[in-house]
């Protein structure tokens, strides 16, 4: 006889009158007037089990049950008595009258109630096995599974083939820090865990596998944030003989179908925005279009004001001055403005200038701000005109290097838009807001090392007609790169790749990678590109981020079964941990500070 006939959460009226065998965990046991009720739980949900004292042996077993006991129940599906149904459950119209009850395994008292919504992340991650039993986590894991299956089916129908690429590869230190794996066989040499399968998938294109994908782990040893993990899962795709528009069309359709099937959400149109436009209007390459606030450019009109806070960046190369008008913002208190001032300092801003607009018609006299006295009438009039200010508005200002202004005022835009004030005053639209950001710069200037660095990676193709700009004007060289953005999150990013060895060598030269270094690090790619490499490009989605957005989870750690903390630790297994001296000797490794390793 099968140990189980049905999942608990899938027992419905369709099984009325049938005998079922269920396995699961005791979520709750209730004793009501001599009858014991058990809420039995498995990954699909709950079912109510009724234990009647008429079956003495079974009833005695039921009396000994406690939360999280693992049990097997055999019983009759029947309708719940009138007035006791639960419309919130799939099984809420029925109950199972227990005939047989077996305890498969007892449980010690759990360290927390599974329905406790106020657990610290440390408690949850230390007791991850129990945390994963919670319905919230099980819903997340099931959505992740269903999404991955749908993605695989979609790509299969589109002619993509799943090919695995190596986990142990060559270190290329130009990007983020690698996770290194020492070789026991080759003394003093190391593998690197992949930050992405980028070069392998390009070589698969050269090899003729014109539509490739895999759902794979990638690794980056970088500082963690709420949406970052040292190991993460990527939906990695590459195609040959498709241009940018065709690549974007395929993957827009994939994401649109996933949201419709899994969430019954129509994402609608994906507007297209250039990187320059996104940075100019929102200070970000992944703008959250739900927030209805935009920058107003003021750099030109601030060049001749006496206020050096504005005039200095306005007249300095690479400087920028912008305004952010907050409709109705004059009701924001001085204390809240002070909090916003401290907030923008996180992003390098020295402070936050502001003007409250009490009465536009009065010009200077209708404004409230400590900076008004430093601005001439023409500048004030132009600020009010360009921002479209109205009575009751608040205007914030950012003035500094362009990056600091974009980062700080861009973050302020989101902070205000997502605040209670923003939501109450129509500054935030509760909707899904997808878009494509295109025409990224090919290079960005590394001021510390006085050299150009690749914005995405050095294998991205320049836009048509921009190849010579790599040498003559790298600041204005644009790339065939594109990001899919949703609600201010980068869901996926990709590009058309360089498929000619001579162009790839030019990019290495622009990045000041010598021919010798290029040959040592990427010789296998340069060689492959000489064998009739096809035009190719691709895109990769972060599966963890995608599921975080779809579930509305507060943290990416809520959609990963066994995540790391923000200190890159696994609290369940206590990884990383010291290793045996013998293991180190076999790897020809000696620790500089053995005591530090044992102390963590």
From Swiss-Prot:
It comes from Delftia acidovorans (strain DSM 14801 / SPH-1). PANTHER family: ASPARTATE--TRNA LIGASE, MITOCHONDRIAL, ASPARTYL/LYSYL-TRNA SYNTHETASE. Aspartyl-tRNA synthetase with relaxed tRNA specificity since it is able to aspartylate not only its cognate tRNA(Asp) but also tRNA(Asn). Reaction proceeds in two steps: L-aspartate is first activated by ATP to form Asp-AMP and then transferred to the acceptor end of tRNA(Asp/Asn). InterPro entries: Aa-tRNA-synt_II (IPR004364), aa-tRNA-synth_II (IPR006195), aa-tRNA-synth_II/BPL/LPL (IPR045864), Asp-tRNA-ligase_1 (IPR004524), Asp-tRNA-ligase_1_N (IPR047089), Asp/Asn-tRNA-synth_IIb (IPR002312), AspRS_core (IPR047090), GAD-like_sf (IPR004115). The record marks 32, 83 as: Important for tRNA non-discrimination. Its main location: cytoplasm. CDD domains: AspRS_core, EcAspRS_like_N. One of its GO terms (molecular function) is aspartate-tRNA(Asn) ligase activity. Homodimer. Keywords: Aminoacyl-tRNA synthetase, ATP-binding, Cytoplasm, Ligase, Nucleotide-binding, Protein biosynthesis. Its EC number is 6.1.1.23. It catalyses: tRNA(Asx) + L-aspartate + ATP = L-aspartyl-tRNA(Asx) + AMP + diphosphate. This is Aspartate--tRNA(Asp/Asn) ligase. L-aspartate binds at residues 174, 220, 456, 497.
